C-alpha cells in the first residue's frame, strides 16, 4: 500500500510523537511532585494531624528568657594577629555601638 520511504517516515513521525508525549507526561509528573512538596513545606508545623484526636491540645514551646549579658572584653586586650594594624572599635559595654 505504501512504499518503503513513506513507511519509514510514518515510523519516524510516530516515534517522535510517542517520545514527545512521554516527555510531556514526565514534566507534568515532576511538576506535580514539586508543587506538592512546596505546598506541604508552607503549612505550619503545629497543625493538627487529622488522624489524631481533634480535641487534643497543642502545647507550644516556652520562650527562653535571656540572661543578663556579661561585658565583652576590649579588642586591645585580645588582639590575635600581630601583623594586623587597627582592629574595629571594641565593645567593652554591651550597649556601646548599638
Curated annotation (Swiss-Prot):
GO terms for cellular component: extracellular region. Residues 1-29 form the signal peptide. It is found in: Secreted. Its main location: secreted. The keyword Metal-binding does not apply. Belongs to the FAM24 family. PANTHER family: PROTEIN FAM24A (PTHR35860:SF1), PROTEIN FAM24B (PTHR35860). This is Protein FAM24A.
